[in-house]
Every structure is written in structure tokens, then in C-alpha cells.
């Protein structure tokens, strides 16, 4: 698992059918770090600190072993100082 922060929503209306309509968010480990795109499985907002999983765990967390994701948000952290 990784601790990451949600930077903003990513709008992508034209997708492959397997992705469905799950929200996509831009996340990073800290401001200035490389950005990544994560599937939002729980309903996050920009500024939230979240727990993310990758690889096959990301696909299963998104709802299916065949889901095309390599990063999925699985939890919102209630308190985190960002260090």
C-alpha cells in the first residue's frame, strides 16, 4: 500500500468499455512528486490523504481481476500530517 494525496479529478469521458464509469483522480505521494492516476473506489475529494494499492490488488479493489487499473484508492486517511 501507498499513502498518497488526491490533487484533482481527472475527466475522461471516452474510455474503453471495461473501465465503466468509475471516477479517476490525480494523486501524488507529496506535492511536487510525479503524478499518477488512480481509480477512486470509495468517493474521495481533492486534498484527501488516501491509501492506494497497485498491481493485481488494484484490479481486485476496483471490482474485477480483469479491470484495467494499476492503482486504486481503497481508503481515506482520517488524520495524517503528510510527512
Swiss-Prot record:
Biotech utility: Expression of 10 genes for alpha-carboxysome (Cb) proteins (cbbL-cbbS-csoS2-csoS3-csoS4A-csoS4B-csoS1C-csoS1A-csoS1B-csoS1D) in E.coli generates compartments that resemble Cb, contain RuBisCO and have its catalytic activity, showing it is possible to make artificial, functional Cb using these 10 genes. Cargo proteins can be targeted to these organelles. Artificial Cb assembly in E.coli requires csoS2-csoS4A-csoS4B-csoS1C-csoS1A-csoS1B-csoS1D (but not the gene for carbonic anhydrase, csoS3).
InterPro entries named in the record: CsoS4A, EutN_CcmL, EutN_CcmL_sf
Keyword Transcription annotated: no
A cellular component annotation (GO) from this entry: carboxysome
Main localisation: other
Domain of life: Bacteria
Signal sequence annotation: none
Localization annotation: Carboxysome
Domain notes: The tight homopentamer forms a pore with an opening of about 3.5 Angstroms in diameter which is positively charged. A short loop (residues 30-33) protrudes above the center of the concave face to different degrees.
Protein name as annotated: Carboxysome shell vertex protein CsoS4A
Gene name in the database record: csoS4A
Amino acid at each position: 500500500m501507498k499513502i498518497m494525496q488526491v490533487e484533482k479529478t481527472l475527466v475522461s469521458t471516452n474510455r474503453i468499455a471495461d473501465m465503466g464509469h468509475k471516477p479517476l483522480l490525480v494523486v501524488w505521494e507529496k506535492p511536487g512528486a510525479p503524478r499518477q492516476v488512480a481509480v477512486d473506489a470509495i468517493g474521495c475529494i481533492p486534498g484527501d490523504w488516501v491509501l492506494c494499492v497497485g498491481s493485481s490488488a488494484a484490479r481486485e479493489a476496483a471490482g474485477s481481476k480483469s479491470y484495467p487499473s494499476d492503482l486504486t484508492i481503497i481508503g481515506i486517511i482520517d488524520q495524517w500530517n503528510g510527512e
